[in-house]
From Swiss-Prot:
Protein name: Tetratricopeptide repeat protein 33
Composition bias type Basic and acidic residues, residue spans: 238-258
Gene: ttc33
Source species of the chain: Xenopus laevis
Gene3D superfamilies assigned: Tetratricopeptide repeat domain
Region feature Disordered, mapped onto this chain: 231-258
Residue windows of the TPR repeats: 59-92, 93-126, 127-160
Tagged with keyword Repressor: no
Entry keyword set: Repeat, TPR repeat
Length: 258
């Protein structure tokens, strides 16, 4: 704070001693004011620290109460407790991760994904948050995204056998099943398209009836020009009526016998 100094007005005569006296008093007052300002700022800072400590302690208490309520099956009340705790400590990733688990338990999948995403944003190295996010994404049907979340969690903590054996392997099996189902569906659609391309003929139309009649007449004429010849041995031979002679093996044998 700037020190107050006596300023001589124009036309006035002030002795040097009086002027120095006022300046000394002003300097003393400025020192007192500065010390009061320091005490006031320190008090404000201490008050903020106390409030912050109170918020952290209260948030921890609400978190624990919410956990007990969730274990007792009172999910809605647990969510209320955790929402209050989030208002006090919005940077606590564990609160969002616990909230995501309970939201999945009450089948609110999309809010669960949002809560888990917030958890990994607050703490990107939180393995359980990535695991919960992957499970929520699986429940939403986003298998590829879930596999990515599980892989990130394993990259952070490769020793997490549960994440590897249960979550990631299960997600990969679901992905293979989805691919097989999609492949079968594509084949079925291709068969339907092929069937649609085959024209549906009207077999009772005049053109088809006329063609069938012509084929029938041609077959009758061909049959009429054939003659059945029965040999002595009982075998039958077909020959055209236009031929004058019919020679068989049996007749040759008959002539030789005579």
């Amino acid at each position: 704070m700037a020190s107050f100094g006596w300023k001589r007005k124009i036309g006035e005569k002030v002795s040097k001693e009086v002027s120095q006296h006022f300046e000394e008093e002003a300097a003393d007052e400025s020192v007192v004011l500065d010390s009061h300002d320091v005490d006031w700022l320190h008090a404000i800072k201490r008050k903020k620290d106390v409030l912050l400590e109170d918020n952290v302690a209260k948030s921890k208490r609400l978190k624990e109460e919410g956990g007990l309520l969730a274990e007792d099956g009172r999910q809605k009340e647990a969510l209320t407790k955790w929402d209050e705790a989030i208002q006090l400590t919005p940077g606590d990733a564990a609160l969002y991760e616990m909230k995501a688990q309970v939201l999945m338990g009450v089948h609110e999948i999309f809010p669960a994904v949002q809560a888990a995403e917030t958890a990994v944003q607050r703490n990107p190295h939180f393995v359980e948050a990535w695991q919960t996010l992957g499970r929520a994404q699986l429940s939403l049907g986003e298998i590829t995204m879930a596999i990515r979340s599980f892989q990130i969690g394993l990259h952070i903590c490769p020793a997490n056998t549960e994440l590897w054996e249960q979550d990631l392997n299960w997600a990969r099996q679901l992905l293979l099943q989805k691919m097989d189902t999609e492949s079968a569906e594509r084949k079925r659609r291709d068969v339907n398209i092929t069937r649609e391309q085959i024209p549906d003929y009207d077999f009772e139309s005049d053109e088809v009836v006329a063609a069938c009649d012509a084929i029938s007449q041609k077959q009758k004429m061909a049959a009429a020009n054939k003659t059945v010849v029965v040999s002595a041995s009982g075998s039958e031979n077909l020959s055209d009526r236009k031929e004058d002679k019919v020679e068989t093996n049996d007749s040759k044998e008959f002539i030789k016998a005579r």
